[in-house]
C-alpha cells in the first residue's frame, strides 16, 4: 500500500526522514530513519494531513513519538499482510505464530501480526529475542461474544509463548484478555484517550 492511507494503528509506514524530526529528537531516532526503517502508526489526535507515529530503537526504552506528513509516506504494511510472511528466526514468538496461523485462518477472521514480530517480519530488522511476546491484532467491527473471547484466549495461551491480542473495534482497541475476563468494564483505548466501558462496540460509550 502507498499514499495517504487511511492508515490505522499498528500499520508500518516508510518514508519518514531525519529532517522531519523535531530538533530535540534523540540521536538513535535519527539513526533508525537514516537506515530506512519504518515507523508505526499510533493512536493520537492529529491535524489534517498528519498521522501520529512512533519510532523504535534497539532497546525497549528507545521509543519516540512523532508526527508524519501523510504526503511523505512512500508505502505502508498492515498487520494482516504479515500473517503468512515466512519467519526467518528461531524465536518462540515466531514459533507461536506458526502454531496459531492455521487455527486463526480457519475462523475466517481478519487478524494480523504487530509489535516486535510484525516489525521484524515487515522490515527484516532484528527486533525479537528469546523472551519476546507475540503481539496480534483482530479486526472486530461487530461484537465478539465474551464466551467466544474466552475460547480464543485459551487457544492463544496454548501457543507456548506469551501472546497479547488486541481487539480492534470501530472506536479504538481493547485487550482480548480483558474482554475474556470477569470484569464488567474494560479499558478501551482511542485516539482521544482511554476509558472504562461495558460495551466497547457501543458508540455512545465510546463518545462518553
From Swiss-Prot:
Coiled coil: none
Keywords attached to this entry: Nucleotidyltransferase, Transferase
Catalytic activity entry: apo-[malonate decarboxylase ACP] + 2'-(5''-triphospho-alpha-D-ribosyl)-3'-dephospho-CoA = holo-[malonate decarboxylase ACP] + diphosphate
GO molecular function: nucleotidyltransferase activity
Active-site residues, Swiss-Prot/TrEMBL: 133, 135
InterPro entries xrefs: Holo-ACP_synthase, MdcG_C, MdcG_N
EC code(s) of this entry: 2.7.7.66
Top class in the EC scheme: transferase
Cited HAMAP family: Malonate_MdcG
Role of this protein: Transfers 2'-(5-triphosphoribosyl)-3'-dephosphocoenzyme-A to the apo-[acyl-carrier-protein] of the malonate decarboxylase to yield holo-[acyl-carrier-protein].
Family: Belongs to the MdcG family.
NCBIfam families per the UniProt record, alphabetical: malonate_mdcG, PRK01293.1
Protein name: Phosphoribosyl-dephospho-CoA transferase
Organism: Pseudomonas fluorescens (strain ATCC BAA-477 / NRRL B-23932 / Pf-5)
Amino acid at each position: 500500500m502507498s499514499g495517504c492511507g487511511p492508515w490505522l494503528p499498528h500499520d508500518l509506514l516508510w518514508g519518514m526522514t531525519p529532517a522531519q524530526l523535531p530538533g530535540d529528537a534523540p540521536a538513535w531516532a535519527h539513526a533508525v530513519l537514516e537506515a530506512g526503517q519504518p515507523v508505526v502508526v499510533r493512536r493520537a489526535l492529529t491535524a489534517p494531513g498528519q498521522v501520529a507515529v512512533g519510532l523504535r530503537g534497539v532497546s525497549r526504552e528507545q521509543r519516540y513519538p512523532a508526527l508524519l506528513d501523510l504526503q511523505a509516506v512512500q508505502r505502508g504494511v498492515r498487520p494482516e499482510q504479515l500473517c503468512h510472511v515466512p519467519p526467518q528466526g528461531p524465536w518462540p514468538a515466531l514459533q507461536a505464530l506458526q502454531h496459531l496461523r492455521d487455527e486463526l485462518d480457519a475462523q475466517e477472521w481478519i487478524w494480523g501480526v504487530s509489535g516486535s514480530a510484525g516489525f521484524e517480519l515487515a522490515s527484516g530488522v532484528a527486533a525479537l529475542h528469546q523472551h519476546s511476546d507475540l503481539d496480534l491484532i483482530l479486526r472486530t467491527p461487530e461484537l465478539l461474544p465474551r464466551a467466544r473471547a474466552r475460547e480464543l484466549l485459551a487457544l492463544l495461551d496454548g501457543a507456548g509463548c506469551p501472546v497479547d491480542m488486541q481487539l480492534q473495534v470501530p472506536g479504538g482497541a481493547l485487550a482480548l484478555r480483558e474482554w475474556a475476563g470477569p470484569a464488567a468494564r474494560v479499558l478501551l483505548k482511542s485516539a482521544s484517550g482511554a476509558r472504562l466501558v461495558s460495551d466497547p462496540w457501543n458508540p455512545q460509550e465510546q463518545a462518553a
